[in-house]
Structure formats: C-alpha cells, structure tokens
C-alpha cells in the first residue's frame, strides 16, 4: 500500500482533491489514462460508467514498464491483482470493466444518484 500513498501524493490534481475532500466522479467512458483518477481518495464511480484498461505507453504508443507501473499505482490491491491476472496491462488493447463491477467487486464508492 505504501506505493499507492506515494503515487497519490506525487500528483498535483490528486493532491488537490485529496486535500479538499471534494468528491471526484468518474462517469461515462473512462479510457486508459482516465483510470489514473482512481488514485483520488474521494473518487466515486457511476454505476453505468465503463472503465477501459490497457498497458501504459509513451507518446509513440510503445508499452513501457514505468508507465504501466505508474498506472497500477493508481489502483487498489483487488483491482491491481485482477488486471494483472487477466493480462490487461500487457497489451494496448482496451479491456472494459463496468462501473457496477468496479463498485461490487473492487470496492469503489458508488456516486450518489
């Protein structure tokens, strides 16, 4: 868990929301880098959202271990284990997890209706 805490503190937008306590909502289609918002302590996920996971990459779309590790650092342990076990982080193909599953299976907070 220490790496997740370091990750959260190192990102300015994450720090802003974590300090303010303001709720950050993930809604709609959340592709790849958008999943970094999962690092925000006060994040919630809309039940109808779709989050798309893939390996981290550089600007040339070449997969890199450092970018993938950076992304994995935004995820809680259960989600991190799932995306690793399913090999989602080994390809640039998108792998969808729906908001309902993020809430029920991985313990993320549901956004208020």
Where are the language model's segments positioned?
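Glycine-rich beta-to-alpha active-site loop
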Residues: 22-60, 64
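Amphipathic, alpha-helical segments enriched in basic
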Residues: 5, 13, 26-28, 78
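Extended, non-globular alpha-helical segments
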Residues: 1-19
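Short, well-ordered helical secondary-structure segments
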Residues: 11-13, 17, 33, 38, ...
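Soluble non-cytosolic domains of exported or imported proteins
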Residues: 4-8, 28-32, 66-69, 97
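Charged, glycine-interspersed solvent-exposed loop segments at helix/strand-loop junctions
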Residues: 15-21, 61-113
